[in-house]
Amino acid sequence: MSNESNAIHTIQFSGSGVFNPDVLDATHKQLDAVEADSSIEAVFLRGEGKNFSQGLDLEFLMANPDIFSEFVTSTMHLAARFLTFPVPVVSLVNGHAFGLGAMLVLASDYAVMRGDRGFFCLPEIDIGM
């Protein structure tokens, strides 16, 4: 899920890039490591295959409705952390960016998106979130 090259730390979202509590925790741990390493000058976010991120893991949320509110709040904390991160964050949007994935792109300092494929979408209102 991560790779360091010189002064750049890359966070790569696996598969469709859906966010569940484990992915959120892993992302926070990577950000903690970057903040602790003064040699890191930038963070790159990237997806895999045709997806940057499909957003929240809706299957997980449907199976765990009791933690819905807490989980959504924790995703907002992650987006806020990217907004205020001490080194530049660059989103390399290789494909679809939905929901939280799209919000992380918006919270980045810079974003580059392929022009030939991928959708950028915030579907929360359409699905009643």
Put a short name on every predicted segment:
Residues L78, F98-M129:
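CoA-thioester-processing core
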Residues S16, K50, R117-F119:
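A short, glycine- and basic residue-enriched loop/turn
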Residues L92-F98:
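Glycine-rich beta-to-alpha transition loops that act as phosphate-gripper elements at the mouths
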Residues T84-S91:
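Short beta-strand/loop segments at the ligand-binding rim of alpha/beta enzyme cores
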Residues S39, R46-R81:
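Glycine- (often His-adjacent) and acidic-residue-rich active-site loop
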Residues M1-E48:
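Conserved CoA-thioester-binding segment of acyl-CoA-metabolizing enzymes
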